[in-house]
Amino acid sequence: AFALQEQAAQAGLPLRCTILESDPSWGGKIVTHRIGDIVTEAGPDSFLSQKQAGLDLCTKLGLADQLINTNETGKKACVLHRGRLHDLPEGLLSFVPKQLGPFLQSGLLSWVGLVRMGLEFAVPPGSPRDDESLAEFLRRRFGVQAYERLLEPLMAGIYAGDAEQMSLRATFPRFFELEQQHGSIMRGMMAAKKSASSSASSQPRRTMFVSLKNGLSELVSALTTRLMQQGVELRAGVQVDALRVRSHELGRWMYDLILQDGSALSAESVVLATPAYVSADLLRPLTPIAGGLLDLIPYASTATIAMAFPRSLTSAIDGFGFIIPRQEQRHLIAATWTSLKWPHRAPSDQLLVRCYVGGVGREDILQREDQALVATVREELANICGIKAEPVYTEVNRWWKAMPQYTIGHLDRLVQLDAALSRYPGLVLTGAAYRGVGIPDCIRDGAVAAGQVVRDLLGKVHPGRE
């Protein structure tokens, strides 16, 4: 809606915009809780600074001075291997470890595994026509050991997914591009790093992930305030039960939204930013093909458990947290030492921890009651890193069918979806189900959707969305 107001003004297009939200509050999965001096995030706790859309929106909303980097000290992260935590090599996310010595001596990979990972430079590129799974791609390029012990929890964990089912080109298109352009991920990453250092920006230095000083809900508050100032009508707690289409006297479609209370809202353009399974139900009567394609986008359920412990009893804990490979067969997916990673998150005498459970193939634990879920997580924390203290604060946040899964064939299905909707100008889909699950991805996709709406309302023929 923000991008739509911006682009409509630039095009000289007058419009009246209404936003309907079924939840009683705004922000979707962005939910910040403030309890005294403790700040927790029920959903995402940060966003990638390398994707400019998030930073740009914060700047436009006057939040640039509220952006915070991760702490400078104690940056290390760990991975669990055979029941023990091992330091992850710095630079692993770019596949170019900054210090080879500690990595070689860590015991994470055998010498055979290390040599195989290093041979990535010599592995020929795969076919540009194949939609390879993320697991197949990473094993092919880096070997089985590196995949199972390092890369699977790092990459698949972002989507709470199963790398065997995830589409490489839909989830990590950059890896596909680097392989095709440079013949090697490592070679491509080094070239990208060299290019970035030669074109250093005058903008403030940002860590890979950034957040907002008082939590990400600041972004939601600033956005809703700005929209109301622009005259946008915001209606929370309003559920749409049906979407109908009728012919307009000027020869274009008109859309009728049938609300839960029986009333209706008519519009020349409708943007559905709902989960794919909700959009499927709304679109199926208009186009069964689109409804069926949307049904093919599965969702994973997850939960986050936040706990605050006395720092005096957890003084040995350092770094930013740890990840757990699927092969370790734990309930925990990962844990973040929130108060060590971010400033302004907890009093100095407390350690704030955020734990993650659930995801594809590991959702059974979510059926447990809160108390049992917390007990399970505490038991694993005690076993893995020795935290046996009683938490002084605990909260559980469950997210049912919250994380869309980009399975093999996802991009082809999006092309078919666009074709199925092409006969309904002004009807647009956007959100995390399609072209990226991160906050900057959704901001960018929302801006693309806004551009499509403006073109439709101006009566221009628009090209297919990228």
Descriptions of predicted regions:
Residues 89-90, 96, 316-319, 333-466:
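Conserved flavin/dinucleotide-binding core of flavoenzymes
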Residues 36-125:
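Dinucleotide-binding Rossmann-like beta1-alpha1 core, especially the glycine-rich loop
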Residues 5-35:
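Glycine-rich FAD pyrophosphate-binding loop
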Residues 2-10, 32, 225, 284, ...:
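Short, well-ordered alpha-helices that flank and scaffold nucleotide-derived cofactor binding pockets
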Residues 76, 96, 100, 113-242, ...:
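Active-site/ligand-binding neighborhood in enzyme catalytic cores
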Residues 15-17, 270, 391-394:
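Hydrophobic anchor at the start of a short beta-strand
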Residues 236-353, 360-367, 371, 379-384, ...:
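Mid-domain catalytic core of redox enzymes
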Residues 33-41, 288, 411:
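Short glycine/proline- and charge-enriched loop/turn segments
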